[in-house]
Regions:
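Extended, intrinsically disordered, low-complexity segments
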Residues: 2-8, 14, 244-333
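Alpha/beta enzyme core
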Residues: 3-217, 221-241, 248, 258, ...
Length: 333
């Protein structure tokens, strides 16, 4: 197996998901650990959300503040730590078509399965924020053409997703967004289309039926979102939930912080007891981070004199190890 084999396999897997006539649910977040959690929960792909990267790296909104190096470094870590395909949010491509060329090639080299580039003006705004403005159709098509050419020079399996933000922009309409999406595929060469801010079932169903490429969407309508079965019946290929893991983590952290301030250590005991009874309590968290691999490498390659003394020290011992003695309390003094 070569270094690139796992990367190629994940890219081919992502293309297989896009080619299937069924819905794929794609959770999103910002960290390798969240991607691993999604993998362990049985999801087939994961989204590195630019909004979450901005929030958790810098504590700022999704306004084009993160840079290419931020994205590529994070994407590389995420791709290396999980076995499912990663689609990354490359915002506007960090510039014009020339910048897009380098953005795509850096992301290809990072080992992810694909990237999305949106048609907003720079500096961009969040895909759910008011005040968005879009570049011209010609400029957008040129950016996607540049993305495809840069991709083809390195790995044609890498997926280019074109995101259309016209529906949420000033004066935008479904008719214009629909025509743009078709042009991004027909003239730009995009493999996947993200119709952003779609608000009605009728519009989404038409987009899935008539755009000549798989469609990705996030529901933005005022009425309740379609069920996953309804999405699949419409022909939607990817239902994206870009912030769900981070939102769940923030909600839990906020709850626990307030309970700790109000009740002291009792809150931690209650929280740990509840976690132990939940699905989370059944997760091997050390295995999730790769601790067994560390122990295996120590046992295989370190001299006996240099190996960590798991038997005689306090703390966690890898479950597979020979040192099975339970942790002993630390001696006072």
């Amino acid at each position: 197996m070569t270094l690139q084999d796992p990367v190629i396999r994940k890219r081919r897997k992502f293309r297989e998901l896009l080619a299937q006539k069924r819905l794929t649910v794609m959770p999103g977040g910002f960290s390798p650990l969240y991607a691993r959690l999604a993998q362990e929960a049985g999801f087939e792909c994961f989204f590195l959300a630019g909004s979450q990267l901005a929030a958790f790296l810098y504590g700022v909104p999704d306004n084009g503040i993160i840079g290419l190096r931020d994205l590529v470094d994070h994407a590389r870590h995420m791709a290396a730590r999980c076995d499912i395909p990663i689609l990354v949010d490359a915002d506007t491509g960090f510039g014009n078509a020339v910048n897009v060329h380098f953005t795509v090639q850096e992301c290809v080299r990072a080992g992810v399965a694909g990237l999305q580039i949106e048609d907003q003006e720079a500096p961009k705004k969040s895909g759910t924020a008011a005040g968005r403005r879009c570049i011209s159709l010609d400029e957008a098509v040129g950016k996607y053409r540049a993305a495809v050419a840069a991709r083809d020079a390195l790995d044609p399996e890498f997926v280019i997703c074109a995101r259309c933000d016209v529906l949420g922009a000033e004066g935008g309409s479904f008719a214009e967004a629909f025509e743009r999406c078709i042009a991004y595929v027909r003239d730009g060469g995009a493999d996947l289309v993200w119709l952003n801010s779609v608000e009605t079932r009728e519009e989404l169903a038409r987009a899935c039926r008539e755009i000549p490429a798989p469609v990705l969407a996030i529901w933005a309508g005022h009425e309740p979102a379609p069920t996953l079965a309804e999405y699949e019946e419409m022909g939607l290929r990817i239902a994206l939930y870009p912030t769900m893991t981070a939102s769940a983590g923030l909600e839990a952290a906020w709850q626990l912080l307030n309970e700790l301030r109000e009740k002291g250590n009792v809150a931690l005991a209650e929280w740990n007891a509840a976690a132990a009874r939940s699905r989370w309590g059944k997760v091997d968290r050390r295995a999730l981070l790769g601790n067994p691999l560390i122990r295996e490498l120590e046992a295989r390659y370190l001299p006996k004199s240099a190996q960590r003394d798991y038997a005689g020290t306090w703390g966690h011992k890898p479950a597979f190890s020979d040192e099975s003695a339970p942790p002993q309390p630390r001696k006072p003094g």
